[in-house]
A protein has these predicted regions:
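Gly/Ser-rich helix-loop-strand patches that form or flank binding pockets
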Residues: 3-5, 26-30, 101-152, 250-292
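Small/aliphatic-rich secondary-structure junction motif
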Residues: 2-57, 157-206, 210, 232, ...
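General small-molecule cofactor/ligand-binding pocket signal
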Residues: 36-38, 88-92, 143, 191-193, ...
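Hydrophobic alpha-helical membrane-association signature
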Residues: 20, 70, 130, 175, ...
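Structural beta-alpha unit
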Residues: 1-2, 16, 23-26, 42-45, ...
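Active-site phosphate/pyrophosphate- and oxyanion-stabilizing loops and adjacent acidic/basic residues
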Residues: 25, 75, 79, 132, ...
Length: 292
């Protein structure tokens, strides 16, 4: 069975969504995955104005009519995808975030690929609420980014360099393992990034002894080397200093990274140092981000 055998791509018929679908096409083509295109029809009051809604006798009529229309649109949307990919379409009615998470669970999806609502110079303020909820609740990895509308045609998407940003928490092993396997699949270079915040190397405006800084770097390097051995993964270790989201984005920009892989918290949200910055990393990253 393929590593990513089932991929779920929510479709909202927007340019950003189309870009996300192109990444999903590339992955499904490479891994010979089943690609499910999911469109969620929100409750009627979210679709119609107060003047339009009374024209329908019941909410059932509204939902059924809308669902049939969306099914036709989604089928047409699917026809434009890569002919080599096995595509299944599904239209459901309900809360978008809830339905995306539930569909992923029921289908045993290995990956969700979806766009955020952020774009342009204001993207850091605009991580969509649906994306945020999916990131919080989904059990499988989520592939997203605020700039996916800029994605090239699926045939021109390449993965030459992968950055795996870890904080050495317990979940870092799974994150590095996923990033390493993805890098091997595409014969890509792997950078393993750890960020030491400035608060760890300065206190009250005074920097610690440079020898202590060097000791901290060595401790981190040894921890990463142990993870590499445990996961049978190897990459170039990059230890940065500063604000984690900005440092990770800086590495991704300077090294022309094609994908950033990070961890996110479990059972109640995002936790830990790097994981606490997961949303900020998503907003700042110049390339797509997979959260594990």
């Amino acid at each position: 069975m393929a590593w990513l055998s089932t991929i779920l791509a929510p479709v909202a018929f927007s340019p950003r969504c189309r870009g996300a679908t192109q990444y999903a096409e590339t992955l499904a083509s490479h891994f010979h995955s089943q690609l499910t295109l999911l469109h969620v029809v929100p409750p009627p009051l979210g679709l119609f104005t107060a003047l339009e809604a009374p024209a329908y006798s019941t909410a059932t009529e509204v939902s059924e009519e809308t669902q049939e229309k969306r099914k036709a649109e989604l089928a047409q949307y699917a026809e434009g995808l890569c002919p080599d990919v096995a595509v299944r379409t599904e239209v459901v009615f309900g809360d978008p975030a809830h339905e995306i998470v539930e569909t992923a669970r029921e289908d045993h999806a290995d990956l969700i690929v979806m766009a955020t609502h952020g774009y342009g110079p204001f993207r850091r303020f605009l991580l969509g609420s649906v994306t945020a909820k999916v990131l919080h609740d989904a059990a499988c990895p989520v592939w997203t980014g605020p700039h996916l509308e800029q994605a090239p045609d699926y045939r021109n998407i390449t993965f030459r360099r992968i950055a795996c940003a870890i904080d050495l928490a317990d979940s870092s092993r799974c994150v590095l393992q996923w990033a390493g396997q993805f890098a091997r699949e595409f014969d890509a270079q792997l950078d393993i990034v750890h960020v030491l915040p400035h608060t760890l190397i300065e206190l009250g405006g005074m920097y610690f002894d440079p020898e202590w800084r060097g000791h901290a770097v060595e401790v981190v390097r040894q921890g990463i080397c142990r993870l590499e051995q445990e996961t049978h993964t190897s990459g170039e270790i990059l230890i940065e200093f500063g604000d984690p989201p900005l440092a990770v984005a800086g590495v991704a920009t300077s090294r022309k990274t094609d994908l950033v892989v990070i961890g996110r918290g479990k059972h109640g949200g995002l936790g830990g140092r790097l994981r606490a910055n997961a949303y900020a990393i998503l907003r700042e990253s110049p390339c797509p981000v997979v959260t594990i």
